[in-house]
Amino acid sequence: MKRIEPNIIKTSYYTLVSANEGVGRTFWCKRQIAKVLRTTSDRIIVFDVTGEYADFVLDHDRIVPGRIPMILHQYKITDDKPVAAHTIEVDMAMGKQPQLIVHDVSRTMTYTWHKGVLAITASLIHYLAGREHTKTWLFLNLDPYSFEDESESSWTVLERVVKQHGQEVKPVFTSRKLGVKEINRRLNIKS
């Protein structure tokens, strides 16, 4: 693991596998997710571009005791399009909604950033439809400002998700370029 500046790390995929491990943003995000899961019934959706959050689904009884319905989607590239390679459900009774949804797009993003963001965000928009009065925490460990041109698809689709669902979606960004306050200001979200 190589530290490149405060609160930012580069590491191999699937090496930070505990809620009590990690450096900077990764460690902070895992603690925040566990805190929400322990104290509320709010839903959490995580875009995981680093492959570091699967443990919340696979080992959640240790991290967050109790029967909390969780689901993990891991994606791969097929015919130049991202598709779900694996879906892992934990404590998901028939008709029950997951409290934590992790979209592991780490391998997809190594091939195509734009198509990955568009495909995964489309599934997020579908999930949020009809749930306007359900508070959802949206953890994005990806940077919507990775491309300076705001007309880029990665920016447009993320902006649409946040603005369409207003205050019912609480975004938690882990941007390398901009802080949470600055991103929220650009998206017209009151911190």
Residue ranges and their predicted role:
Residues K2-L16, R31-S123:
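Switch/coupling segment of Walker-type NTPase motor domains
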